[in-house]
Amino acid sequence: MRTGKFTAIIILLFITFFISSSTVMYSSTVIDKIRPTSEEIPAGYMFGQVPGFAQSLLKSNPWAFDQTAIKKMASRIYPGGEPSRISDIHMTIITNKRNPYGDDIVCYILIFKNEKAASEEMAKLNEFVSFNSDRAITIQKKNLAVYLHVDNVKDFDHIKTMSETIRKRLESL
């Protein structure tokens, strides 16, 4: 009788662990593991500089948004972006060296508060990207989304390469 109870408890613990591990969500700690690094910047490009007028909101580049920036920028990143569903946003601006204040390539890493919020927000983001498929790419995994876009279609190959690197990093986590 005791052996049966012990076996049942072990099975129950295993099932609980399996279910909880399959629904683990990402937190801001994943950002540093997947974000673009200075070594990955294409030749002739650099991290962009934040212009003076924007420094009160965007403190530096690359930068993890504070809550004020999330509230002000969510709907500017993609139409209908809902800041209450986003826990973290990391932004990397890459620009041509000839124009250090430009935003030729931008990578946003968004961490949503839960998978339901991620699903609803990704629907909006994917719809937006579908209208800009020659200039934007998204990657989604659980409650995380990576959104890369370029101003000029000639730079699309750069974000394609960056997205492949980010995708590989996500798969290795």
Give each language-model segment a name.
Residues 1-11:
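Bacterial N-terminal signal peptides that target proteins for export
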Residues 12, 51-53, 69, 114, ...:
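A generic structural signal for solvent-exposed, polar alpha-helical segments
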Residues 22-90, 156-173:
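N-terminal "mature-domain start" segment
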Residues 27-41, 46-47, 97-112, 116-173:
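A short, solvent-exposed beta-edge/loop patch
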Residues 72-106, 110-114:
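Mid-chain, structured segments of secreted extracytoplasmic proteins
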